[in-house]
Amino acid sequence: MKTIYIWSLIVAIPLFGSMADYRKMKKINLLHTSEVVQDTINDIIDSNSVNIQDSSLVYSLIHVESTGNDSCVGDRHLVIPSIGCLQIRPIMVREVNRILKDLGNTTRFKNKDRWSRKKSIQMFYIWKNFHHKESTNEKIARNWNGGPRGYKRKRTLQYWEKVQKKLNKQL
């Protein structure tokens, strides 16, 4: 047993070294290829600068997700419910923090930030500007509702129709 354990350590050490090198390379690549995304994210964190089309999308999502209620708790049947005006789950908070870390930003969000409308909107824009810089409103909304491949799922079509209906009323 001990020899297997020692052998597994000897084999694992080079793997961790190469994984760390891979992460460094990935981070360097991200920093060089997405400076615009990083600048946009810094603007989002530092101020409230967004364009009108983006704001109409986020407010349509807020209306569909929570009808504007910042204290909304959804999916109570699940172990961890979605919280706030945009119905954010802890996994989205982790994803936003991962994005910020990859981009070299020291800002981090906590799960309790989901209760804040301003911070929820900031998290949404960070996610959107990183993953959906050039995506359509439909793809953004369907992925927000259904996860990374949400735009491919039939169940997100009804969600998109609700968002689109609210968007059309705003325009």
Kindly give the residue locations of the regions a language model identified.
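Positively charged n-region of N-terminal signal peptides that target proteins for export
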Residues: 1-4
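Positively charged, phosphate-engaging catalytic surfaces used for nucleic-acid and nucleotide handling
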Residues: 9
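Bacterial Sec-dependent signal peptides at the C-terminal "C-region" and cleavage site
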Residues: 12-25
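Catalytic glycan-binding domains that act on GlcNAc-containing polysaccharides
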Residues: 24-171
